[in-house]
C-alpha cells in the first residue's frame, strides 16, 4: 500500500520558515569577511601563478605577502587584480610552449595524452627516468605523465630540449616530423 504525504502542508511549512528569517540574515558581508575573502583569492591566484611558472621552469614571481599586513579593502582588491592578471598571463604562456607544433607532431605518432601503460606514459611517451629528470615537480605532485595536462607534458619535454637533449628522446617520430 502506498503512503501519501501531504505536499501542501510541507510547502506551507517551508514558506512560513522562509518568511520567519530576518531580512538581513544572509545579507552584506562585514569588512573583515570581505578582507578574508580577498586574501583567499589573492592566495589562490598566487598559487596558480607559481604552479604554472614552476611547470614552465621559470623563476616564480616575487612577493612581499603584503595582503597579510594590510587591512585596506581597496589595496586588497588591487593586489587581487594584480595576481589575477599574473595568473592569466602565466596560463596563456603555459598553453603555448615555444616548440608546440613540434611536440604536437611528435604526439601524433606517439600515444594518447592519458596513456597509462608502462614503461612509457602520456602523449609524448616519457619513461620514469625522463619524468624524474625533467618533470620531478609534476611527478611528485600528480604522479606519472598520463595524469599531467598536455601543456605540462610539453613543458617537461621543453626542459629536456633546453638541457641539450634536443628531440633525440623521440628519434623515430622526430625524424618523421623533420626535427632531426
Regions found by a protein language model. Give the residues of each.
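Short, histidine-centered active-site or binding-site loop motifs used for metal coordination
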Residues: 110-111, 138
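Secretory targeting and sorting signals
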Residues: 1-28
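A generic structural signal for short
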Residues: 91, 115-116
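Generic structural signal for secondary-structure transition and capping sites
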Residues: 111-112, 166
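Intrinsically disordered, low-complexity
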Residues: 21-108, 174-180
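Structural recognition of the beta-strand scaffold that forms the well-ordered cores
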Residues: 104-108, 114-115, 123-127
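Catalytic and binding regions of secreted/periplasmic enzymes and modules that target cell-wall glycans
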Residues: 118-124, 128-180
